[in-house]
Amino acid sequence: MNIPFNSVSKIQWRNPSPVSDTSCLVCGDPHGKRHYGAMSCNGCKGFFRRSIWEKRTYKCSFNNECIIEFKYRNRCRACRLKRCLHVGMDANAVRSERTRKIKTEIDGDVKLEIKEEPADSEDADDECPLDIKPDIAMAWQTKEIIAHMLYEEDRVLNWEEPYNKLRYYTMDSEVLQAIKDPSQVCARTKINWNSHSRPLITIEALRFNWCRTFTLTIDWFETLPEYRALIDDDKELLVKFSLMPVGWLWYAYKSYEYRCDGIVFVDGSWFPRDKTIQQQVCPTCVLYYGRITESFMADVVNSMKELEMDETEMVLLKAICHLQPDYRLTRRGNDVISTGREKYKRALCEYIRMKSNGFMDASFRLCKLMQILPVVDILGKYEDESALLVSLGETEFNGSGGGLPYDIHASDSHFARKNRRKSDNQYHQQHVPLHIQ
């Protein structure tokens, strides 16, 4: 008994033979004619001719083993050209045809007459639907990156440790020490984004949420190999650059996920978008979040709703948002950060291509997602201004000697000396107005 496909080669299996003698040997289109020495359709003829004339080079992302068939022949041009040559299309015939055409046009004695092809013009490369999937599957490297990031996201969000309820968070810490051991700033208490009671935020909740978000975000930074590879000085700068934007991206996704019309916090409290409800919130919290909330909802949360953003896109965006090159970093630090940023951008591009219905759809979605990043960066700057106002004028926000928010949010803190905060506290205690340059 003959077993079906027993003698079929790998290339024949991935590129099935045409169903009739008049089919295109490249893609299987039933309307084939002999072009350049092989049976081919007008689309493949035009593709082959342009590729040879213009000396185009293509690159395959899947080891030169893509399926070439009529409906999906545009997926990989490298494999399509390889298939054209494999079935016997002659590149020399294309070159000689072009030579004859140029000579005829120069002489001007003979008018070149080109017969129009019905419907399927050779210059109209492909009639394939535009809504096809552009890629069969993601590369295994991308799958591993995404799987690792989703695992770490879940681990960090569910990381709980025993703590002393009498003193489990403080703002009195040096930045570098807080980065090295974020549990000094806040114990790893249970994260509760979706509280059933959903209380309005208070000044005490504001202080706690600032500290718990700091610990949560630093814990997440530590999951990225690029961050772990940096020296301490680069880590400190990178935290100051990206702590707020990454936090706002996280908050926005949780507000979108739990359909909260305002900012949702890690302890389950919230700050409302509705200004009528804001009247029930303490003035310090309104000063802190009032300016931020409208842009937060309109420009970030609503964009996530329109796109129906998923968690994979969110974690990849967080990594891109975090890894921002800057002239103040060391050269090695910038190299590490730039390489990592490109890695996560490629992973995001490939993931979006996989889940989209075509290149146009994928490009549009990628643009809309990337437009979120400058918005959360602006939200971070808004919070810098709000936090400075509150931390300098509200002892109930700072607590006793709480200078970490000031060091993180101050615009000139990247260049501050180690004793800068001590001097600022002395001025503040003497009630001398402090102006941020």
Swiss-Prot record:
Positions of the DNA-binding region: 21-96
UniProt entry keywords in alphabetical sequence: DNA-binding, Metal-binding, Nucleus, Receptor, Transcription, Transcription regulation, Zinc, Zinc-finger
Transcription regulation as UniProt keyword: yes
Taxonomic superkingdom: Eukaryota
Pfam families cross-referenced by the UniProt entry: Hormone_recep, zf-C4
Keyword Metal-binding in annotation: yes
Compartments (UniProt record): Nucleus
Domain NR LBD residue range list: 141-409
First and last residue of the signal peptide: none
NR C4-type Zn finger ranges: 24-44, 60-79
GO biological process, one term: cell differentiation
InterPro entries the record matches: C.elegans_NHRs, HNF4-like_DBD, NHR-like_dom_sf, Nucl_hrmn_rcpt_lig-bd, Nuclear_hrmn_rcpt, Znf_hrmn_rcpt, Znf_NHR/GATA
GO cellular component: nucleus
Record GO terms (molecular function): nuclear receptor activity; RNA polymerase II cis-regulatory region sequence-specific DNA binding; zinc ion binding
Function according to Swiss-Prot or TrEMBL: Orphan nuclear receptor.
PANTHER family: NUCLEAR HORMONE RECEPTOR FAMILY (PTHR47630:SF7), NUCLEAR HORMONE RECEPTOR FAMILY-RELATED-RELATED (PTHR47630)
Protein family: Belongs to the nuclear hormone receptor family.
Designated name of the protein: Nuclear hormone receptor family member nhr-100
Organism the protein comes from: Caenorhabditis elegans
